[in-house]
Design a protein with these regions (language model features):
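Beta-strand-rich interaction surfaces with strong enrichment in secreted/lumenal proteins
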Residues: 755-761, 785, 850-854, 903-906, ...
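Structural beta-strand segments of beta-rich domains
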Residues: 715-719, 859-861, 870-872
Length: 942
């Protein structure tokens, strides 16, 4: 199929290619109409004058207002909709004369996934002539952009949006592991590089907005979109989301649009129902788990886009909620970008949720709530026309429209569309997309995402010199589809696990392969509840795999899931291996040969039998196009696996919800004795807990130190520890820091992730690590749903997983009153102390001008303030026998002996109390420092 597509591309798959495009793509794109394109600016409205919005040096908000004032209602409403790209809604790959008669003659907000190669779910990539190579693709998007710049009245450029959670979704681009796999790297810098590459390749291809990252937090392992989350911990999701956005938006190369806001990933029973309705969470859990990543990524990374979600929360659809899209998102979080709906989410207000009577009412509710841009699988007319009617009928204020359009224009200005609307470096696109350096980072991401779950008897790594015959089987052994799904690159070359092993062992070992079974059987998913017997064909295929295993030194069985079992609208009722996979594994294990199980899947699986009877297990998730190479490197010891779980593996689906973080004792039942006379009624504990992962080497943790051990709510503490590689191989360790609030006014989590670092250590090498603990780690939502830091003890735990804690210590948080009393108690009995002439110190407080304390340059007098007083001025009476000018400083201290200068000046007048004001703050001590000799202070008043 790939060869056929490639041939079509070479010959040209469109008549427009022959009619409008030169035979060879130029190295640089230059628009045809030169009179619009002035030196240093573009005359978008073609009036011959540099308007404010056309002036790159003008202030951002001034440019927005100038353009908005020139826009008609038709032009404004066209900015509030997405046009789905080629072969979805848009039937043309390049502009046609008909476009001047269609809705977007007045412009369009965004064009989504145009010419990215995706057609529909289950179909092969498009064979259109403009999907590849990169230079031709960029040229085609430029031509579309040129229509909006040159052939619309105001020339407002379009925002080309696209998916990008594992590399930009294009016919070809650098292909990374799925986002769940990327989460398992625990590597902030790597995630930033993934974002940087994805954003850079997107812009070189002509896209300006990437729908990434996914900021949903995984809570139910049955959920179909579990493959798209970073993990279960809101802290980890936030930390990696921040890095992804910083990479994507580097130098404003593209806008990053995080999704799905809000409370999206925990719908009832993991059933999607197309609207993802009725999420099962308390208000406090929504805040602690699901809102937390969005809040931090918006505030700390400046994310420019947010996608609103399909679901309701407590009966209120998010898509129509002013509370979620305006009060919380813009008001509380300070979001300044634009909100785009998930596809058809507006329609769902009346087709699914039943909170609007028709499309017009759904449009009104959405726009009033805070929606800027409607994304849809349908014609943009279906949104824009009722929107215009609402304004004309008085059902919606045009000022509301203005507010929504301001946000859209702000993003377009920020990403440079009004200064450089075209991707002019066409030759650069061919050099940049899938370049060697990017591919190397993709391979490293694949390696770092893989988790070693079991390695009994140190079966792994395999000795390539003594392993002469290897049996490989399983439905995922020679499968590449997991790397070519929607939301990422579609037609790249994939190295399968089989190919990776064959390449690694070439000339050294014989590889015997048979599939063994399909991913699912003919009765699946019903076969999860009814035990259908094996067919003759199924038994014969398993028998072939068994015969290969008997001949081999080791059997590598590659099982898991794929597009049939995981993905959007692919939630499950079981977490067991689907189809005949377990029967295949059991048959291979029964041969008595060493077995290595490799899992390639998009969610945790309950592999209890494998954990008990198979000696070595690797979890690879969907490891990207380089997955086969990465797994071969790990199997044969060229890379030491260091990934750690960001999700919990339940032993059975009956334990769900079963995740991290959790409330104390909420995931374990009473009873310890099994059997007919016991008191145990259900399975307890995780198969593999959050943070778990093995290595080919060992690590020792030591020397935990917390400094300071006592802080106030707005102060921070530093946690230090040492980690040493005590094994014989170099390797990575993900060092995890957890925190527990010992006593609080509400029930808090048993432990919460508070920090992590992935480090690489050679044998016998040690490294000191440090973590900062501050307010964001300590605060809780109190009974009044207010974020507060309550005084008390917090246990800090460093370990190799959430259940493998190696070191712990206690941090104490004091309230301000306790701290003030402690400082007061530590003060000397004397209220005044001096650097010299202490016998005269009290003279400055006796209210007599003729008695004084005298000092020389560098001398000082210090006053202890009562109960941490807030001071913003002090009155001082200076005297000097020669009346020459003298300078001095006023300093404040919050305790601990450190003073900061808050005032420097010259004595205004001698022999008189003069007030000297400064910026006030709470302080425990005030000091007056002399900068000249023989200066006296007669009186001081506060």
């Amino acid at each position: 199929m790939k060869n056929l597509i490639a041939l079509t591309l070479l010959l040209g798959g469109s008549t427009l290619l022959c009619a409008q495009k030169p035979a060879k793509t130029p190295a640089t794109y230059k628009p045809v109409k030169s009179e619009m394109y002035r030196k240093g600016w573009i005359d978008f409205n073609k009036n011959g004058v540099k308007d404010v919005y056309e002036d790159p040096s003008a202030p951002l908000e001034a440019r927005i207002e100038n353009l908005l004032q020139q826009m008609t209602l038709d032009e404004k409403t066209c900015q509030m909709v997405t046009l789905y790209g080629y072969k979805r809604v848009l039937k043309d790959d390049l502009p046609t004369p008909e476009w001047k008669e269609l809705l977007w003659k007045d412009g369009i907000g965004a064009i989504d996934e145009h010419l990215n190669g995706f057609q529909q779910w289950g179909l092969p990539p498009s064979d259109n002539a403009y999907v590849w190579p990169a230079s031709r693709h960029a040229w085609a998007l430029n031509e579309v952009q040129r229509f909006f710049v040159e052939d619309t009245r105001l020339g407002i450029p379009v925002d080309f949006t696209n998916e990008g959670i594992r590399g930009v979704e294009s016919y070809r681009a650098t292909n990374f592991p799925t986002q769940l796999g990327l989460g398992h790297t625990w590597n902030r810098e790597l995630i930033r590089q993934v974002g940087l590459i994805t954003g850079r390749e997107a812009r070189m291809l002509g896209y300006t907005n990437v729908y990434a990252p996914i900021l949903d937090v995984g809570r139910d392992q049955r959920w179909g979109r579990y493959e798209e989350v970073y993990g279960e911990s809101p802290y980890l999701v936030a930390e990696l989301g921040i890095e992804m956005v910083r990479g994507l938006q580097h130098n404003h190369q593209v806008a990053a649009t995080g999704k799905h806001f809000a409370a999206y990933s925990n719908n009832k029973g993991a059933r999607e129902g197309m609207a993802r309705v009725d999420p099962q969470m308390s208000p406090r859990e929504v805040e602690n788990i699901h809102i937390y990543p969005f809040k931090r990524v918006i505030r700390e990374a400046g994310m420019l886009g947010v996608m609103s979600s399909y679901n309701d929360y407590d009966g209120i659809p998010v898509q129509g909620s002013y509370y979620w899209l305006t009060t919380r998102l813009r008001g509380e979080m300070g979001f300044r970008g634009y909100v785009v709906s998930d596809s058809d989410a507006v329609e769902y207000l009346y087709t699914k949720h039943g909170t609007a009577k028709d499309m017009k009412e759904a449009v009104r509710q959405s726009v009033e709530a805070g929606l800027n841009v409607r994304c849809t699988f349908r014609s943009p007319d279906s949104f824009v026309l009722p929107l215009r009617e609402l304004v004309k009928e008085g059902g919606l204020s045009e000022e509301v429209i203005n507010d929504r359009v301001r946000d859209i224009l702000r993003v377009k200005f920020l990403i440079g569309l009004f200064d450089a609307p075209y991707q002019t470096d066409l030759a650069g696109a061919d050099r940049e997309v899938e370049k060697e350096e990017n591919e190397a980072i993709a391979l490293q991401a694949s390696r770092e995402s893989i988790v070693l779950l079991k390695n009994a008897g140190e079966l792994l790594p395999l000795d390539i010199n003594s392993t002469k015959k290897i049996a490989v089987c399983g439905p995922n052994a020679n499968e590449e589809g997991y790397a070519l799904t929607h939301y990422g690159p579609l037609a790249v070359e994939v190295t399968t696990v089989l190919e990776g092993i064959q390449e690694k062992t070439k000339g050294k070992a014989e590889v015997l392969y048979t599939k063994g079974c399909d991913l699912v059987d003919a009765h699946w998913p019903e076969s999860e509840i009814i035990d259908y017997p094996l067919t003759d064909d199924e038994q014969a295929e398993i028998d072939k795999a068994v015969e290969n295993a008997r001949q081999a030194d080791v059997a590598i069985v590659v099982l898991g899931g794929g597009q049939r079992t995981c993905g959007e609208n692919k939630s499950r009722t079981s977490l067991d291996l689907p189809g005949r996979q377990l029967q295949l594994l059991q048959a291979i294990q029964a041969t008595g040969k060493p077995v290595v199980l490799i899992l390639i899947n998009g969610r945790p699986l309950s592999i209890n039998w494998a954990d008990k009877f198979v000696p070595a297990i690797l979890e690879a998730w969907y490891p990207g196009s380089k997955g086969g190479t990465a797994l071969a490197d790990i199997l044969f010891g060229d890379y030491n696996p260091g990934g750690k779980l960001t999700v919990t593996f339940p032993k059975t689906v009956g334990q769900i919800p079963f995740n991290f973080p959790c409330k104390p004792s909420s995931q374990i039942d009473g009873g310890k004795n099994p059997g007919p006379t016991g008191n145990m009624s259900r399975i307890n504990g995780a198969l593999y807990p959050f943070g778990y992962g093995l290595s080919y080497t060992t690590f020792e943790y030591s020397d935990l130190d917390i400094t300071p051990r006592i802080i106030t709510p707005n102060e921070s503490a530093t946690v230090r520890l040492k980690v040493t590689n005590t094994g014989k191989r170099a390797g990575d360790e993900v060092v995890q820091l957890y925190i527990r609030d010992v006593l609080s006014s509400i029930t808090t989590y048993e432990k919460n992730l508070a920090g992590f670092q992935r480090i690489h250590l050679e044998p016998d090498e040690a490294q000191e690590l440090s973590f900062t603990i501050d307010r964001k780690h300590l605060e809780l939502l109190d009974a009044d749903m207010k974020w507060v830091v309550e005084p008390g003890d917090f246990v800090l735990m460093a370990g190799a997983s959430s259940e493998d804690i190696r070191l712990n210590g206690t941090l104490t948080v004091e309230d301000y009153q306790t701290r003030a009393k402690a400082i007061e108690a530590q003060k000397p009995a004397k209220r005044v102390s001096t650097s010299t002439n202490p016998e005269d110190a009290e003279n400055v407080l006796d209210e007599k001008i003729n008695t004084a304390w005298q000092g020389n340059k560098g001398d000082y007098i210090t006053f202890a303030l009562k109960n941490g007083a807030k001071v913003d001025k002090v009155a001082i009476a200076f005297t000097r026998d020669n009346n020459l000018p003298a300078t001095f400083e006023i300093q404040l201290s919050g305790g601990g002996g450190q003073f900061l200068t808050v005032y420097s000046g010259t004595v205004s007048e001698y022999g008189k109390l003069i007030s000297y004001p400064f910026k006030g703050t709470t302080a425990s001590d005030l000091r007056i420092v002399l900068n000249d000799d023989r200066v006296s202070i007669a009186e001081v008043k506060f």
